[in-house]
Structures are given as C-alpha cells and as structure tokens.
Amino acid sequence: MNFFSKVVVVLISVVIVYGVLTLGLSELGSEVVTLVRPEVDGSNKNIRVWIVDADNKSWIEHGDSESYWIKQLSNDSELLIIREGEEKKYLAFADRDSHDLYHNLRREKYGFSDKMLDILAFGAISKENCEGIPVRLEKI
C-alpha cells in the first residue's frame, strides 16, 4: 500500500470514528426524547433531542431564530414529545431567557457526554457559542 492510500485510509477512519463517537455520545449520554417537529410542508419529522427538567417544566433545544418550527411557536402552540415510549402533548414556548439555565441543566444531566460533544463540535454547542433557542415545555 503506497503512502497516499494509507493517508486516505487514516482520514476515512478518523471520519468514521468521529461519527460513531458523536452519535454514541448523543444517544447514550442519558435520556433522549423524540420531538415530533412540524415541517414547512405540513408534515412532521421525528428528531432525537436531549431534554432537561426543573420546577415542573422541561426544555429542549433544537433550532435557532431562523428555524421554521421555532418561528411557528405562539402562546397556544402544542408540541408532541415521545418520552419513555409515550406520546405526550406539551404547550411549547420559545424561551430565550432560559438559555443559560438550559445549558446549566444540560451539563448537570448529561455531564461527560455534554462535555465530549462540546469538544467534538469545537465549542459550537457551548453556552457561549450556541445560537439555539430553548423551548420551554409545559405539560397539558
């Protein structure tokens, strides 16, 4: 095997290991729920997300101010979350003021996985760099 082939094999291996680590840490870190996210065309898409809880409320974060589904949230928006195998309806509110709270709760709950994913994402998901908008969920 020549030098170029070895470099290609190493690069492909690094990409595969990176992908497996990212997926493994996000799925196996702790509780993962399924957000049934509304799409522009009226359909729904199932998205796996982390969820945190405090004071009888829950928060998820998946999307920024340009995300269609975030823009659609209003005072009476309902979201469907599949949690512990059960579909549960929540009132959903874009909650920019809870950004730091969400990240602190996420670090508490997901610990090592949260730290490692932050490293693998080169700091893009850290509290300081994240542009995501937390969504507060209140049980109906």
Set out the residue ranges of the language-model regions:
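Short beta-strand segments
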Residues: S30-S65, L79-I82, K89-D95
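Aromatic-capped interface at the extracytoplasmic side
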Residues: V17-R37
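N-terminal Lys/Arg-rich, disordered targeting/topogenic segments
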Residues: M1-N2
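Hydrophobic membrane-insertion alpha-helices, especially the h-region
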Residues: S5-L23
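Covalent nucleotidyltransferase core used to form phosphodiester bonds in nucleic acids
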Residues: L23-G24, I60, I70
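Short secondary-structure boundary/capping segments
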Residues: L25, W50, I125-K127
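Short, structured beta-strand-loop surface elements
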Residues: N44, E66-I140
